[in-house]
Amino acid sequence: MTRVKRGNVSRKRHKKILNMSKGFRGAASTLFRTANQQNMKALRYSYRNRRQKKRDFRRMWITRVNSAVRRYGLNYSEFMNYLKTHKIQLNRKVIAQLSICDPEAFMQLLLF
């Protein structure tokens, strides 16, 4: 049986990892072992931060709505309860956008 050498396979694998680690600093973009470790870490961070981003945006929307509502003497939880009891189904993103871009429409929510 002929001897199988895996030079092409390993070169392709190394090249794939090094291409994925372009833009990393120092040895993390040139040496395979460190590039591989940094690449795995970067993928873990990106997975984690895709979920973190959703929490961050929700927190930002709540903060914006809270600050906008406090101008009118309410707080966030009272305002959200008010919307729920009056069957106004707007999500936090839309409410936060209204409070910034269209204060008159936001005021109409309070007067509904």
Swiss-Prot record:
Pfam families: Ribosomal_L20
The UniProt record lists the keyword Nucleotide-binding: no
Claim: NAD is one of the keywords in the record: no
Cellular-component GO terms for this entry: chloroplast; ribonucleoprotein complex; ribosome
Entry protein name: Large ribosomal subunit protein bL20c
Primary subcellular site in the record, as a coarse category: plastid
Job of this protein: Binds directly to 23S ribosomal RNA and is necessary for the in vitro assembly process of the 50S ribosomal subunit. It is not involved in the protein synthesizing functions of that subunit.
A Gene Ontology biological process term: translation
Keywords assigned by UniProt, alphabetized: Chloroplast, Plastid, Ribonucleoprotein, Ribosomal protein, RNA-binding, rRNA-binding
PROSITE patterns: RIBOSOMAL_L20
Source species: Chlamydomonas reinhardtii
HAMAP family: Ribosomal_bL20
NCBIfam families in the cross-refs: rplT_bact
Places the protein is found: Plastid, Chloroplast
InterPro entries tied to this protein: Ribosomal_bL20, RIBOSOMAL_L20_CS, Ribosomal_protein_bL20_C
Top-level taxon of the source organism: Eukaryota
Gene expressing this chain: rpl20
GO molecular function: rRNA binding; structural constituent of ribosome
Family note: Belongs to the bacterial ribosomal protein bL20 family.
